Amino acid sequence: MRILGIETSCDETAASVVMRDEEGRGRILGDVVLSQLEEHSAYGGVVPEIAARAHVEALDTLIVEALLRAGVKLEDIDAIAATSGPGLIGGLIVGLMTGKAIARATGKPLYAVNHLEGHALTARLTDELQFPYLMLLVSGGHTQLILVKGVGEYERWGTTIDDALGEAFDKTAKLLGLPYPGGPAVERAARTGNPERFDFPRPLVGDARLDFSFSGLKTAVRQAAKSLEPVTEADIADICASFQRAISRTLRDRVGRSLKRFKAESASVAQPALVVAGGVAANQALRQTLQSLCDEHGFRFVAPPLSLCTDNAAMIAWAGAERLAAGLPADGLDVAPRSRWPLDAEAKALIGSGRRGAKA
């Protein structure tokens, strides 16, 4: 089967054609992503109105380009998959309405995909991973530990009670006068810094729960920078290195506990696996921490290519293919976008978790 995927949940406009064969193996036939970095960089973050307008201007052209790269026509497509949430509502409307129009015009089924499910299933596209497995999602809008049991079957083990990890990176960069996006800027600065100069806090470390908290770390960064004013480049490098060290130590505690829990509850799984997904997964220091943890606990560490960790339409197309192959029903043309859409509908909301970024 061939699926056309559309992604417009935040500040990337993307279209992709993905094939899934009868054995369940996937292949990306055509994939196009257009970043809006230049449009938002002057504001130090994503401006929803600008993002939505940029999606309108680019999406049609990107869909045509994805089909051309795949060497197929619309009539060769078996289904349409479009991100329906969570994310910025303006962008979601653009992508989902486009998907509906194509589905109506071609008579093909439409799958309104949860963006987080796209991340959760990417490892099956890239590494043919079998269920169940554990996923750490780290992005600008989410920091979650999720047990992936099957297509449409997810159990949230932990989440952030305040800032997402990507948000903490962006805010730290902004505090230090580093460019947007903040994640790569902080990582670059940290390479020449002393990670032990500042002993930043690690909230919730040692707690029996698997939840995260990063707002206190952000506050500590602000206080450190203020105490050094005017800060030098060396100070900034040391703050960034110490910031990353605090995050790595936090992940060792939270993720380490989750690996032990997975082994205890899924003892029959011969080769347990941890998947990392989301834009922050590009950070090499954090990848090294997770690889080390997996080595210690006997887990396979799966990190999809960086192009599939950040927002893309291939993962949306693949999620649609997985849902179609599993026999899950398509969505009606009256399906509505959802700015908030938890992957685990049974998970309880946490006190203090009201603000969660663009993709809450």
Curated annotation (Swiss-Prot):
This is tRNA N6-adenosine threonylcarbamoyltransferase. The keyword DNA-binding does not apply. Required for the formation of a threonylcarbamoyl group on adenosine at position 37 (t(6)A37) in tRNAs that read codons beginning with adenine. Is involved in the transfer of the threonylcarbamoyl moiety of threonylcarbamoyl-AMP (TC-AMP) to the N6 group of A37, together with TsaE and TsaB. TsaD likely plays a direct catalytic role in this reaction. Binds 1 Fe(2+) ion per subunit. The lineage of its organism: Bacteria, Pseudomonadati, Pseudomonadota, Alphaproteobacteria, Hyphomicrobiales. It catalyses: L-threonylcarbamoyladenylate + adenosine(37) in tRNA = N(6)-L-threonylcarbamoyladenosine(37) in tRNA + AMP + H(+). It comes from Sinorhizobium medicae (strain WSM419) (Ensifer medicae). One of its GO terms (molecular function) is N(6)-L-threonylcarbamoyladenine synthase activity. One of its GO terms (biological process) is tRNA threonylcarbamoyladenosine modification. It is found in: Cytoplasm. Disulfide bonds: none annotated. Substrate binds at L137, V138, S139, G140, G141, D170, G183, N283. Its cofactor is Fe(2+). It comes from the Bacteria. GO terms for cellular component: cytoplasm. Its EC number is 2.3.1.234. Its main location: cytoplasm. Keywords: Acyltransferase, Cytoplasm, Iron, Metal-binding, Transferase, tRNA processing. It holds the Pfam family TsaD. Belongs to the KAE1 / TsaD family. Fe cation binds at H115, H119, D311. Gene3D superfamilies: 3.30.420.40. The keyword Flavoprotein does not apply.
